């Protein structure tokens, strides 16, 4: 099975060219002026073609909270936002703290067969931050462990977790929050645990990825320890670069313009590695009761384009690096650029078309961006060489 994309405006971390793309058996075979006969030919008509976006931080709520989202609706929501790969957090019900639940999620995702799914496993049993799981027995397919949704406040426990994860050559995704300080200051809570975990990464050699970094001091700490060659990476969310001084409940909290300015600076100097959505679906009742989080897969690119490119003159090449290449590198996958032999995970974007945020493919609609207008319409998403989503087609429920 082969697919030819004609008249593409190709943009990845290095390229900004007009060319054709030949896809064969799920891989990019060649780039150039291509005239050979193919099973399927799509004229892109000079729209932008980028590597599919990779979300390092997603909640699909399966198992246990399928009233908010499930693997199918989450995957369609991802495709509608140009995402071809999602890395799921383990704070489900029951918690992903054993191989049985871990493989159940992967098996079901493979049956649905829409996007590439990776799944994190918890670091402690039932996410209670008391008893470590048996890391030696954890499935070797696991890329990262995570206690996402809460920090590991006990420093001795954190040290032991980092040490055990380093032994098996895996990584940890850290939700930096010292819960002893949260009621005093969510800023202090994030900063203190970020500084501690940077130090532990340096001393243990454990690969640490910091989730949803939102403050000046946390970013400065990450920069400082990166310069000491600690094996750390970090992500920021679209809502933390777009919203300021808002009471919309997310964790970590929405910060100030000064924090946003620092995030932009740290994107430009390469301290920030990735943009990740922290897509967190909730029902209206849960939000009314104070649940933290928002959906983000279907608006992430638009916000990144507006804030980074239109307002701060950051190139689409850099946005591709943040949303595709670096996340692929962090996961250790052959994705994220448009080169021969790489996975044919692609998104086609009409960058001149305006969209108005309204209906979502997600089961939930807990978004503060409803009614806002952005440039950039996701027209088609291709996963492993197959068209999995087309705007307005039968699986687009907006």
For each predicted feature, which ranges?
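N-terminal metal-binding scaffold of metallo-dependent hydrolase/deaminase domains
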Residues: 1-36
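C-terminal cap of metal-dependent C-N hydrolases
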Residues: 8, 343-395
